C-alpha cells in the first residue's frame, strides 16, 4: 500500500518536508531587508515596493484554506510536486524580474503555490509517526517553522550586501529542487479523488474575511490606520466576511471546516497557545531589528547577526524537547518554555541606550530556548486527541490562524510602539523647555542661537529615550501576557500512548 511505502521511506520524506517548509517560512521574512535595494533597482515609490510583501501574504492567506480540498482531489504527492515546483519556478522569475509589476505577479504565484506546504507537510508527518513519537517529530517540524523567520533577515541581509537582492529569491532554487527530487523518488503516489462536497459559500466568505483582514493589517501602519477611509472599508469587508462565514459554518450541512474541530478541547486550547507563541516569535522578531538599527546604530547585517543566538537557542531546545517530554511530560515541558519565554522578555524590558550587545545575545538565546520548548509540545498536544480524518482541515485551520495571529501581533506591537514613543517623548519634554530655569540660564550665557541648537539636540535625545521607554514597556507587557498562558496549558489533556492510527488519507476514504 502507498501508506506502507511511505512508512518505509519516512526518513527521506521527512527531510524533504523539512526543506519545503523551511523554504516557505524563510521566504516570509528574507525579502524584508532587500526592499530598499529592490525599490532602487526597479525605480518604485516606498508605498509601491511594499506590495512585494503584501501580495505574497494575501495570496498565501487566500490559497491556504483551499489547499486541503485540492490535495484530496489530486492526491498529496501531486499537490506537493505542484506546490514546490510552482514555488521554485516563481522564485526564479522573481529574481529575473525587471520591474515592480513583474515582481508582484510572481510573488502572488509564490504565495499561491507555497500556501499548502506548511499544513500539508504537518499532516503527512502526523500520519507517518505514532503518537508516542509526536514530541520528537513536532520538534523536527517546528525547527523549520522557527528557523525560517529567525534566519531570514540575516541571510537576506548577507545575500543583498554581498551578492544582489535577486539572490534572496534564487536561494530557493537548490532547496526546491532537492525537495522535489527526494519526494519524487521516495513518496508513494496516492490517487486522491475524495468526493467531499465543496462549500463554495464558505470558501468565498472566508476568502473575503482573510483577504480584507490581511490587507488591513499590512496597509494599516502606512495609512494612519483608521484615519484612512481605505482601512475602514477593509475592516468592514473583513467583519462582513467573518459574519457570513460564521453563519455558513453553523448552518451548512457540509461546512468548509468541520464543526467537530471546535468540539475538541485539546485542539482549541492548543491552537490558542500556538497562535500566541507564533505572535510572540514574529512580533519580537519584527521590532528588534528596528530597535538595534534605529536606536543602537547597528547595520542591517549586524542586527541580523545579533539574532543568531535565538536560532541557536531554538536548535538546543529541539534537541532537548524529546528528552524532556519523555522524562517530565508534555505539559511540564510546555510550562518550562513559558518560564524561559517570560524571562527573556523581562530581560528585554531592561534594554537601554547604553547597553552592550551581550544582553541582546543572552535574551535572544533564552527566548529561542523558551519558544522552542513551547512550540513542539503544543503541536503534539493539539493533535493528540484529534480524529485522523480531521487532521487535514485541522492543520490548515491551525496554519491559517497562526498566520493571522502573527500578523495581528506584529500590527498591535508596531502600533503600540508608535503611540508609546510619542507618549514617552511628551512626558520627557514636559520637564525641559526654553523656559526651564537651568536651561534658560545656560542659554543666556552662551547666546540664544547656540541655546536653541542645544535645545533641538536635547529634544532629539529625548525622542530616542522616549522610544527606548516604549520598547521596554512593550516587552514588559509581553512578559506579563506570556504568564496568562499557564491556566490554559494546565487544562490540556495528556496525549494517550497508542499504536499509530490510520492516516488521514485512509481514514477519509473509509
Feature map (PLM): residue ranges:
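Transmembrane-helix signature of multi-pass solute transporters
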Residues: 86-96, 175-182, 240-244, 316, ...
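Short helix-capping/hinge motifs at transmembrane helix termini and TM-loop junctions
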Residues: 98, 130, 186-189, 221-222, ...
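Alpha-helical transmembrane segments of multi-pass secondary-active solute transporters
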Residues: 49-50, 79, 137, 168-171, ...
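Helix-loop-helix hairpins in multi-pass membrane proteins, especially solute transporters
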Residues: 64-202
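Hydrophobic transmembrane architecture of multi-pass small-molecule transporters
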Residues: 178, 401-494, 499-510
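C-terminal membrane-cytosol helix-exit motif in multi-pass small-molecule transporters
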Residues: 174-191, 208-219, 237-251, 485-493
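Transmembrane core module of solute transporters
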Residues: 8-68, 101-103, 142, 163-164, ...
